[in-house]
Each structure stands twice: as C-alpha cells, then as structure tokens.
Amino acid sequence: MAKIKVDLEREIGTLDRRVFGGFIEHLGRCIYGGIFDEGSGLSDEHGYRQDVLDALRPLRMPVLRWPGGNFVSGYHWTDGIGPRDERPGRNNLAWRSEESNRFGTDEFIEYCRTLGTEPYICVNMGTGTMDEAAAWVEYCNGTGDTTPRSPTCGASRRLSEGGSLLRQRVGRG
C-alpha cells in the first residue's frame, strides 16, 4: 500500500493565487437566471443578481474565467457585443440550447469589476480562428491606436460605443 506524507515544514514552491479563481459558463442557469437575470427583483440595473454577488464577494476570487468549458468552442465573441437588443441569438452547440448573447464581453468585464476580480477570457479554439482570437484581445486591450485585424471589431469600435479600456487575461479553451 502506498502512503503519502505531508511535511508542512518543507516548502518546495509557491502557488500563484490565480489558480484559486472561479469559472462561469453558459450551462444550465449559471449565466441566465444565475449571475445574470434581467428584470428580476433580485438584480441590479445591469441585470446582475445581487444575492449571487453577495455570496461570491467573500470568496475574494482572484480571477473569474469565462466563457469557459465546452461552450467556448462554439462561441463567437462578436455575437456578444453592441446593443443587447441587436445581438443575434445562436444555437449553443455544447449544451444544445439557445444562446441569446445578452451576456457578452462588456457585461462580463463589468461583472468582474463589480465583483472585484480580474477577468480571464477563454478564446474559441474549436470553431474560431486565430484572427478572431486576436481581434478579441485587441477589442479588450487595444487603445484605439492599433490596427485591428477586423476593422469592425477593434478597440476603436469599443471606444466609439462609449466603452472604456477593458483589460483582461486571455487563455485558450
């Protein structure tokens, strides 16, 4: 039989506290009806559920990862920017449901700011392209003086719609 002995006196390295972050995905009621529920008496003017924020704040998550999991492999971020009422609905390929795209990039970044955590965005490595991923990084982190890979999706678009510098970490799938 194998045994494991934990020696609390022997330090072999440190862990980056970001490994203790959180994760949200468009699965079941995690987003819609979970953290985001427009028109609910439990939500603020942005649609963020206050009871959920109150439960999450004490966790002091260093990062929050989105759109995460299987969902991101079919998610195209440009569907989730611009005026909410003009965003296209799509089939959620991972979970076989309808995705309204009412909770998108700007809502996620604002949610993280409200929660006091660092946003961590996962790019689509399934049905997406490297250019799409680069354009998303430029949209979030660009200053408006960069040359976007897609002229309709760069920082200049975010800034023209009144958005501020978003700044986020990016990871793949």
Give residue spans per PLM region.
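Non-catalytic accessory regions flanking glycosidase/transglycosidase catalytic cores in CAZymes
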Residues: 1-173
